Structure formats: structure tokens, C-alpha cells
């Protein structure tokens, strides 16, 4: 019986490349010349620092653009609501969603069951295992998960026939 896992994870190497490209773009941008701004990556958290709140939002846009160029889904970003002000700099922390939370996994399983496809889905930790009789059913589940608006990107692995 064909089966697959639906997971939500960020490629660490591509994320680091996107951050390094963002730093490179930050150094060459005209509107950041003479300003104190930085982008740092440490322990799966990106820290954006700038002299005012507007520039912090520009740094978020730069990071989003570089992530999409490196094929890392920007929907996995979890940006702080408000910039933290300390001294003369504002800083934002950007965290990345790893794994599927239980609530989102339950919604995904319910959506799969409501689609009337002949598959069984079960929650296994931070992933969802889907098994079915035909490969076509699993591909339909993949399309359904990609179209879903659950606020988190999904990847598919352990595809077994």
C-alpha cells in the first residue's frame, strides 16, 4: 500500500544561504548607506536590527525576497508583531515553523477525510502519515495539502509504493 508523510520543515542550508544573500544585499542598498542595520542568523532564529521600525520592515521584505529566490517558503516565517526598541536600534526576531502543530494537523486530517478520498491519515508526532490503495489518491492529497490555507507550508517525504 502506498504511503507518504506530510511534514513542515525548513531547509537549514538554503535558509542560511538566503540570510547571507540578504546581508550582501543590505550592504549594497542605497537606502541603508550610513545607517546601522544588521541581519544575524543563530539557532534557527534570524535577528533583524535597524535604526527605526520602518527599516526593520524593509529588512523583513529583503529576507522574504531572498528566501523565495532560494526556494524556501516565506510562509514558514513567524515574525514578531512589534519591533523591540533598545538604545538607538529596533530589532525584530524571525522564527521558523518546524513540524506540524497538533491543531493544524487535526485540521489537515479533517480536510483529508472530508475530501472523500480513499485514504487513511494519522497524526504521528509532528507529521501526518497518509496511506491509500492507489498512488493517484496520494497525489490528490498532495494537491489538497498544497491548496490548503492553514498558514504553514507542507513538504512530502517517505513516499513508498
Curated annotation (Swiss-Prot):
Pfam families: DUF520. The keyword Nucleotide-binding applies. GO terms for cellular component: cytosol. One of its GO terms (molecular function) is nucleotide binding. It comes from the Bacteria. Keywords: Nucleotide-binding. SUPFAM superfamilies: YajQ-like. InterPro entries: DUF520 (IPR007551), UPF0234-like_C (IPR035571), UPF0234_N (IPR035570), YajQ-like_sf (IPR036183). Belongs to the YajQ family. NCBIfam families: PRK05412.1. Nucleotide-binding protein. This is Nucleotide-binding protein Ssed_3443. It comes from Shewanella sediminis (strain HAW-EB3).
Amino acid at each position: 500500500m502506498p504511503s507518504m508523510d506530510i511534514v513542515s520543515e525548513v531547509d537549514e542550508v538554503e535558509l542560511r544561504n538566503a540570510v547571507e544573500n540578504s546581508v550582501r544585499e543590505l550592504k549594497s542598498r542605497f537606502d541603508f548607506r550610513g545607517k546601522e542595520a544588521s541581519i544575524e542568523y543563530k539557532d534557527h532564529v534570524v535577528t533583524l536590527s535597524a535604526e527605526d521600525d520602518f527599516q526593520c520592515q524593509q529588512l523583513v521584505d529583503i529576507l522574504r525576497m531572498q528566501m523565495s529566490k532560494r526556494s524556501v517558503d516565506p510562509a514558514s516565517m513567524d515574525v514578531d508583531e512589534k519591533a523591540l526598541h533598545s538604545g538607538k536600534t529596533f530589532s525584530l526576531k524571525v522564527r521558523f515553523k518546524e513540524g506540524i502543530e497538533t491543531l493544524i494537523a487535526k485540521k489537515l486530517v479533517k480536510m483529508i477525510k472530508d475530501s472523500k478520498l480513499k485514504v487513511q491519515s494519522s497524526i504521528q508526532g509532528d507529521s501526518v502519515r497518509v496511506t491509500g490503495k492507489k498512488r493517484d489518491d496520494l497525489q490528490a492529497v498532495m494537491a489538497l495539502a498544497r491548496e490548503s490555507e492553514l498558514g504553514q507550508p507542507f513538504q512530502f517525504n517517505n513516499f513508498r509504493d
